[in-house]
Amino acid sequence: MLTDYEEQLWNSMERICGIDEAGRGPLAGPVVAAAVVFPRWFRPGKGILGRMNDSKKLSPSLRREMAPAIQDAALAWSVSVVDAQTIDRINILSATMLAMNRAVGGLGLTPDMLLVDGNRFSPETPVAYRTLVGGDAYIYSIAAASVLAKTARDAIMSSYDRDYPEYGFARHAGYPTAMHISAIRQHGRCPIHRFSFKVRRLNEA
């Protein structure tokens, strides 16, 4: 993956920010968003950053190796976490928008353009943006944000695994796998579960 999309924008602006989230679909844990701004005319080269892809297509070990390289290469980056209790209170869409806006706010600079993975965004500041469905598969800065968000969330879920080992959070990261559903049947929900998320397999309305 190259920075072709960003290069078109760099002709007329400087600070292009990629934004993505991890954790909209799980039954437990936070939603995490990341924002990444690379220097103007950045090129990934042939090293670890030359292997960039949608984080879902990268192995966990490669994501962990890539994340610090992204942070070192970026002009600015930020990660924001919105917990399960907030998700239950304001709903997952609003929580995702909150996480994304907090990530942008944590950059320490004002981007000229936001490139947001997906089809919806509600900016809290007056900045130009584009929503791009599947953007993490072809836009470098969005893919980089997806790696930072996914890596951060995986680390959080691994820490929760130590607190609640009976659920296996390190293995499924809170997603509704058969293992996770079975654990909820046996143990009920724990404090990091999203109580507003209902599961048909648990006969919840």
From Swiss-Prot:
InterPro entries xref list: RNase_HII (IPR022898), RNase_HII/HIII (IPR001352), RNase_HII/HIII_dom (IPR024567), RNaseH-like_sf (IPR012337), RNaseH_sf (IPR036397)
Residue ranges constituting the RNase H type-2 domain according to the UniProt record: 14-205
Cofactor binding note of this UniProt entry: Manganese or magnesium. Binds 1 divalent metal ion per monomer in the absence of substrate. May bind a second metal ion after substrate binding.
Gene Ontology molecular functions: manganese ion binding; RNA binding; RNA-DNA hybrid ribonuclease activity
Transmembrane residue ranges: none
Reaction equation(s) it catalyzes: Endonucleolytic cleavage to 5'-phosphomonoester
Domain of life where this protein originates: Bacteria
PROSITE patterns tied to this protein: RNASE_H_2 (PS51975)
Location in the cell: Cytoplasm
BP-aspect Gene Ontology terms: DNA replication, removal of RNA primer; mismatch repair
Key words of the record: Cytoplasm, Endonuclease, Hydrolase, Manganese, Metal-binding, Nuclease
Binding site for a divalent metal cation: D20, E21, D117
CDD domains the UniProt entry points to: RNase_HII_bacteria_HII_like
Entry EC number(s): 3.1.26.4
GO cellular component: cytoplasm; ribonuclease H2 complex
Claim: Ubl conjugation is one of the keywords in the record: no
Cofactor: Mn(2+); Mg(2+)
Cited function: Endonuclease that specifically degrades the RNA of RNA-DNA hybrids.
Protein name according to UniProt: Ribonuclease HII
